[in-house]
Amino acid sequence: MDMFWFIPTHGDSRYLGTSDGARQVSAEYVTQVAVAADTLGYEGVLIPTGRSCEDPWVIASSLINATRRLKFLVALRPGLMAPALAARTAASFDRLSGGRLLVNLVTGGDRGELEGDGVFLDHAERYEASAEFIRIWREIIAHSHSGESYDFDGKHLQVKAAKLLYPTVQRPYPPVWFGGSSDAAHDLAAEQVDTYLTWGEPPDAVAEKIASVRSKAAALGRTLTFGIRLHVIVRETEAEAWAAAESLISHLDDETVERAQSAFARMDSVGQRRMAALHSRGQRRTRADLEVSPNLWAGVGLVRGGAGTALVGDPQTVAKRIEEYAALGIDTFIFSGYPHLEEAYRFAELVFPLLPRTVKQKLPGQALSGPFGEVIANTIVPRASAR
């Protein structure tokens, strides 16, 4: 069971839908979040893409030397970069980071944004182009280890004698992650990706998606691993956690929610439609309306695109819900929380000890100063509490 965190390159705050409590997405701040994740024992971080985000490859590259073991799940958008250039970019990053690159293929679902980026393809065509893109990307990198070139003649993309002179550390190529809820997305995942990633839907819905992708992959003689993308709001008690959830959306008004939901409704993303369906366009915002499954809260999705649900509860309850998803076949959990720096610590401190995960060996010298809290009376090292 691997735990990932999230680099908030599209902004961070204590509240949704307001500039109150907002933080600047500076080089210093994203470095703080990455270093915290690395120090706390998260396996990696997801770095998103889109016009609302800083460029994921620039951000990820800036964090290589600030971290020691952290893996970088970097978003890659077909249509914004030629596959051969994407292969060179990925290979350079993988070498410079010592083999810490993971790639998240993002097809995109906001037609307005896509057209602004010069991509004028419908839903079916985008998946065709994405499949061709990632095939070329994979094969160019795989061929680099033997020094061979690669040809491809597809409907949307073609390369002739494509060659990568400097191969990746990871063989045959850095692992490819991908998420999508349509049949076309499941087909692409089954054929080409290593980890299928789903947003945090109720367990029954997640189980259906896993079964679909797993069945399609098995028919091709392939196996995949599975991940889930969620927010988390954990506190020492259930009451405190739900109060924090209410606080997160306390600045939202009907106009802001309606504008956000109208924007989401214009997208042709099946996954985004599934997220929106969980909260009925935000017409009501009580816990009873937004708790769509035990401890699974859809409040984030009122105004945030993409992953719109959070696990909410005390440490024991959150750990139990995580284990329920793991029992479905989820191997990797990608979490985030507002604000991302403090919540990275809170989640790791409260929930990590309760999970059946591999505890990383501490780096040399890392344990010499704790963690054990502040020394008592200048002479006594604190012990764990009895509770």
UniProtKB/Swiss-Prot annotation:
GO terms for molecular function: alkanesulfonate monooxygenase activity. Keywords: Flavoprotein, FMN, Monooxygenase, Oxidoreductase. The keyword Flavoprotein applies. It comes from the Bacteria. It is an enzyme of class 1 (oxidoreductase). One of its GO terms (biological process) is alkanesulfonate catabolic process. Its EC number is 1.14.14.5. The keyword Amino-acid biosynthesis does not apply. Transmembrane segments: none annotated. It catalyses: an alkanesulfonate + FMNH2 + O2 = an aldehyde + FMN + sulfite + H2O + 2 H(+). PANTHER family: ALKANESULFONATE MONOOXYGENASE, ALKANESULFONATE MONOOXYGENASE-RELATED. Catalyzes the desulfonation of aliphatic sulfonates. Belongs to the SsuD family. HAMAP family: Alkanesulf_monooxygen. This is Alkanesulfonate monooxygenase. It comes from Xanthomonas axonopodis pv. citri (strain 306).
